[in-house]
């Protein structure tokens, strides 16, 4: 159905894959159903046609479809596929007219030239950021691209945008989709800041500090800078904005949809959950890379903190998409309760995750507080095998210092911070239980895990890395 190469008039081949997916802008894999698309959009269109799917749009039928939010509205995604010419009856590349092939060749050449120009323009700070993950320790997240700053997992890259401007990222991986993560190629990203906090010069008031005293060696301006950076990074890397979550709040899975989840095989639902978790983890990795203090840690410690803490941050972020009024969580575009996950065969894990989310919601945390608490959970000096634990500890102390005074500003309850810190053992316990359940599942379904689970998910929760991930 696809033809991935164009023979040039001179020598060699020009890769169609250099042209981004016409639907979502992700790394393309060739011509599918008549249009240059990624594997994710190809699979989405195929499933839609096979199932004669009829989708509805929860908004105004004009949703933006891009790499980040392509899974949010199936209706608008399918309409974009059709509008751009995707069809079961589309001709293959080999049957294109000479004019069509020449036009496609010209577009490939144009993209290749643009990419080459962008590579030549990279220098200074952009180059330093792009090479921060430059060495190779062993495998997985530690096997890192020396050219572009992408984070590898068994040869598959997490595509992480930089904080501003244009960057050319040689990404070995598209964003997670139903089709998995196994892709290679080039992705150009322009990161548009969503939230501008630079004008907030005094995020904290001096009156909120204990007797107006700062910890030794810590300045007010430094705490303010760290807090603004973390909060901005959090807001820009959440899967859903609070406005979107409010719009979706009462869109719950129907009885028929819940029964469909319950009737799935255990392995099918495990795979779906693994894909969703992997998607969430990619946002967490991007969040971490935007934290100034995190990027100043040595590469080894960055990797260890991500491997051991990314799922814990996903669990903290889960409270944003949890409705404590009816005990439901956002899953695949709608809210559903614990009964949706019966087929997993892990009721205790599901119960503990839901209980934690409900308890965290009861603290009524603001986005500022969730941002700072998430970063404090991630940047923990207690992780095993850190090379510079003292440096990690100093950064975490500054984050907690900022969190303490945001809480004092927002809450009458002086015990809120203590309550948050007391929840960290629960976070760790839930994540450890997830690891145990995964290993039990893997023992009975090794082929499913090895062939169908996302590579990043397998790498992060590999039992061989248990000493690191605790």
Swiss-Prot record:
What biological-process GO terms show up in the record?
A: amacrine cell differentiation; cellular response to retinoic acid; circadian rhythm; eye photoreceptor cell development; negative regulation of DNA-templated transcription; negative regulation of osteoblast differentiation; positive regulation of DNA-templated transcription; positive regulation of transcription by RNA polymerase II
Q: What does the UniProt record report as the effect of altering residue 457 to A in this chain? A: Inhibits transactivation activity
* Chain positions of all zinc fingers (NR C4-type): 21-41, 57-81
Coiled-coil intervals: none
Bias kind Basic and acidic residues: ranges: 104-117
**Pfam families per UniProt:** Hormone_recep, zf-C4
> What is its biological role?
Nuclear receptor that binds DNA as a monomer to ROR response elements (RORE) containing a single core motif half-site 5'-AGGTCA-3' preceded by a short A-T-rich sequence. Considered to have intrinsic transcriptional activity, have some natural ligands such as all-trans retinoic acid (ATRA) and other retinoids which act as inverse agonists repressing the transcriptional activity. Required for normal postnatal development of rod and cone photoreceptor cells. Modulates rod photoreceptors differentiation at least by inducing the transcription factor NRL-mediated pathway.
Q: What is this protein called?
A: Nuclear receptor ROR-beta
The species is Rattus norvegicus (Rat)
């Amino acid at each position: 159905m696809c033809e991935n190469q164009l023979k040039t008039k001179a020598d060699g081949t020009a890769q169609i894959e250099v042209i981004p997916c016409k639907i979502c802008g992700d790394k393309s894999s060739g011509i599918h159903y008549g249009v240059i698309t990624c594997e994710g959009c190809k699979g989405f269109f195929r499933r839609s046609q096979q199932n004669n799917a009829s989708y509805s749009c929860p908004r105004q039928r004009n949703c933006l479809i891009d790499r980040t939010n392509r899974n949010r509205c199936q209706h608008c995604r399918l309409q974009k596929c059709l509008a751009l010419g995707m069809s079961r009856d589309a001709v293959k590349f080999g049957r294109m007219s000479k004019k069509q092939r020449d036009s496609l060749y010209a577009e490939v050449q144009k993209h290749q030239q643009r990419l080459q120009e962008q590579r030549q323009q990279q220098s200074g700070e952009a180059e330093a950021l792009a090479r921060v993950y430059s060495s190779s320790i062993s495998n997985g997240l530690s096997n890192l691209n020396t050219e572009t700053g992408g984070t590898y997992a068994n040869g598959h890259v997490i595509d992480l945008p930089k904080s501003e401007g244009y960057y050319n990222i040689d990404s070995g991986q598209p964003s997670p989709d139903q089709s998995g993560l196994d892709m290679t190629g080039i992705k150009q990203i322009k990161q548009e800041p969503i939230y501008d906090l630079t004008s907030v010069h005094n995020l904290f008031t001096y009156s909120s500090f204990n007797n107006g005293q700062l910890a030794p060696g810590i300045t007010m301006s430094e705490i303010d800078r760290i807090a603004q950076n973390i909060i901005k990074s959090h807001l820009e890397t959440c899967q859903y904005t609070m406005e979107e979550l409010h719009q979706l709040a009462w869109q719950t899975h129907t009885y028929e949809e819940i029964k469909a989840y319950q009737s799935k095989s255990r392995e099918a639902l495990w795979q779906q959950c693994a894909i969703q978790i992997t998607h969430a983890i990619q946002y967490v990795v991007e969040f971490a890379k935007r934290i100034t203090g995190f990027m100043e840690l040595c590469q080894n410690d960055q990797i260890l903190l991500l491997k051991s803490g990314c799922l814990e941050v996903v669990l903290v972020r889960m409270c944003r998409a949890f409705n404590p009024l009816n005990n439901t969580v956002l899953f695949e575009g709608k809210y559903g309760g614990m009964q949706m996950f019966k087929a997993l065969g892990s009721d205790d894990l599901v119960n503990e995750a839901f209980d934690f989310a409900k308890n965290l919601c009861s603290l009524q945390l603001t986005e500022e507080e969730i941002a700072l608490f998430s970063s404090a959970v991630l940047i923990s000096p207690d992780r095993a095998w850190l090379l510079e634990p003292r440096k990690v500890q100093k950064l975490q102390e500054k984050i907690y210092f900022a969190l303490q005074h945001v809480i004092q500003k927002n809450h009458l309850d002086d015990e809120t911070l203590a309550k948050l810190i007391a929840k960290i053992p629960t976070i760790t316990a839930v994540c450890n239980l997830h690891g145990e359940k995964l290993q039990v599942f893997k023992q009975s379904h090794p082929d499913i895990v090895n062939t169908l689970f996302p590579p990043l998910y397998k790498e992060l929760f590999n039992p061989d890395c248990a000493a690191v991930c605790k």
